[in-house]
Amino acid sequence: MSLSIDVTSLPSISSSIFKNESSSATSTLSGKSIGRSEQYISPDVEAFNKYMLSKSPEDIGPSDSASNDPLTSFSIRSNAVKTNADAGVSMDSSTQSRPSSNVGCDQLDFSLNKGINVSANLDSCISISTDHKKEKSKKDKSRKHYPRIEADSDSEDYVLDDSDSDDGKCKNCKYKKKYFALRMRMKQVAMQLIEDL
């Protein structure tokens, strides 16, 4: 797997700050320009004094004292009048607003060129085991299949014995054969139940 990252041009930022001049800050990315142009007037004591002295005391109202600091209030109102925040400025037009000399101008221009190459080899081994015990459902567990027991037996397999019978009362009667067959069948059922438990 190979990953290649090439950053040839990052946004170029230029900024110029001038006293009593327009200040422009622009950035470009993928050919698109985003700009904002604002004009700020720094507080000037002389201009503030002229402004206040040109007005009569009767004309000075609450609008002239919007701030506790009259000098700041004057700067805020002047800034609000001369601000144009909706103007789009491109990189080309921002250079035209700069003066010919760099006196009183703080300028910052930078660009970054980087080439990054990353290569990596991925080796993977996956083994899947599909051996698992098949779980029986609850219905299958509750329903046990017992082997079928045949009740019919040949008379030759059973020896009729009169030892446990009353003397002279049951000698080779027809029920004795059925009794031994039933006893053998019950014995098999009992053994099967014991094995299941």
Swiss-Prot record:
Residues 17-36, 131-166 are annotated as: Disordered. It is found in: Host cytoplasm. Its main location: host cell. The keyword Glycoprotein applies. Its cofactor is Mg(2+). InterPro entries: Rotavirus_A/C_NSP5. The modification Phosphoserine is found at S67, S153, S155, S163, S165. Belongs to the rotavirus NSP5 family. Homodimer. Interacts with VP1. Interacts with VP2. Interacts with NSP2; this interaction leads to up-regulation of NSP5 hyperphosphorylation and formation of virus factories. Interacts with NSP6. Participates in the selective exclusion of host proteins from stress granules (SG) and P bodies (PB). Also participates in the sequestration of these remodeled organelles in viral factories. This is Non-structural protein 5. The lineage of its organism: Viruses, Riboviria, Orthornavirae, Duplornaviricota, Resentoviricetes.
